[in-house]
Amino acid sequence: MTKTSKDGIVTQWELHTIRVREARVGPGAERDELKVTNSVGIIADDYTGALMVACYLEAAGIYAPLVFHPDAEVAESSVVVAGTRARTIEAATAVSNVVEFLDGSAMGGSSRFVYKPSASFDSTPSGNIGPVADCLAQRTGWAPTFMAAGFPEVAITTHLGYLFYRGKIVTASIKRFDPLTPMPDPDLVRFLSQQTDRGVELVSHLDMCRGRRFVENKISALSSKGAGHIFFDVSDEADLRLVADLAARSKSVFIASDPVAVAFAKNIVGNSAIARAAPRHVSGPAAVLVGTVAPVIQRQLAAFSEVHPVLALDLTQSKNPEAIASDAMEWAAEHVGSRPFAIATSRDQSDVERAHAAYGSIGAARRAEEVLGILAREFRARGIKRFLVAGGETSGSVVSALGIKAVRGFPEGPLGTGFCVTTGEDPISLFLKPGKFGSDDVLLEALDHMR
């Protein structure tokens, strides 16, 4: 079913919405009586990005629970955000994880879905953005897929298909030091084309400067030509608004960076958004866990160490992760409950290089995540109530280790996004921070903010 209802035939997704409506409120229910027809499911490829989106939506007055399990229980909402660990795992597993959320009860009533990679579409030549986009297109029957990378507010942009990171072409930026996704090709159209057999075409910033009608005609031409995916430049805020609006009005799968996904969701739910009272932080002992190696976090740890103790682990020692964590617990014992402290899996880039030489980039990352996951469970058992976690993959390992299924994000504030509190009994507060974001004193300020 591919034609519109104007022709007397419903689309595949309209059929899905009718079935959801009849299952929940019975046949014949009016569209404006059913909030689910306007609901949006946003599936992010890491936990910090998922939380960032949830916080932006909360700041816009839209209740947006964040789930880490496909069947997590959440209150009725206009938008549900899901955090996965799909960025760096094997492509087939990443696709499977996304499908679990598509089919899970947490966002099973959503009528539109967005897959949200990082703002710079961090990935490898083999995936996982292309495979997920192909899967979503196949499941919905919608083609071509729309793709849009960029975050102009923080100087992450795309122009003529090329990715610029903080004002520099990505291969000349600090992004080139990323141990898992260094993005060796700045041409995202060419780079993404390695991840899919369906082809990637470009709608450039120059195209969008010629106006909506020109862009709509180009989309139509590319679609008629059989384009599998259409990539849109996001060079500035005007590009961002236009592509989000075009996606909201289309019947296309959308693969979108943080601010584009937020703009899309706001366009879909409009004035019907469900709002709820803001959450409150939990007071209690705090710990900082750092698994990222970005230069930014090194400066942040240096500022933190001027006030609180910091331990840097050596992942290259012959001990297994449990033994490394046990040694760290001995060091932390005198601090737990008495003062904040931080544990990092490296001191500097040289530590990272040694770990990579010993275990490979993926192996070293998984070793670090395992150690920090063990420590998170131990600290939680000993009464830690506030966790500050740096790094998207690290955040995923800590949240998973703690068995957290759902959180409520706090609206964006003076320190930006990243704050949340778990739902259910015995809550804890968390600050999940992307490794490359924040001022030098953000860890210290976050501690004060979470009181």
Where are these regions (language model features)?
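C-terminal structural cap/anchor segments
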Residues: 339-390
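Short acidic, glycine/serine/threonine-rich loops at helix termini
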Residues: 53-55, 125-129, 156-165, 214-215, ...
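N-terminal signal-anchor module of multipass membrane proteins
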Residues: 38-61
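Conserved, well-structured core segments that form the ligand-binding/active-site neighborhood
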Residues: 166-329
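Conserved, well-ordered active-site substructure
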Residues: 384-385, 393-442
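Short glycine-rich or small-residue beta-strand-to-loop segments that form or flank ligand, phosphate
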Residues: 39-44, 80-88, 111-122, 233, ...
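N-terminal glycine-rich anion-binding loops that anchor highly charged ligand groups
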Residues: 62-83
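Cap/lid and interdomain-hinge subdomains that line or gate substrate/regulatory clefts
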Residues: 36-41, 63, 67-68, 94, ...
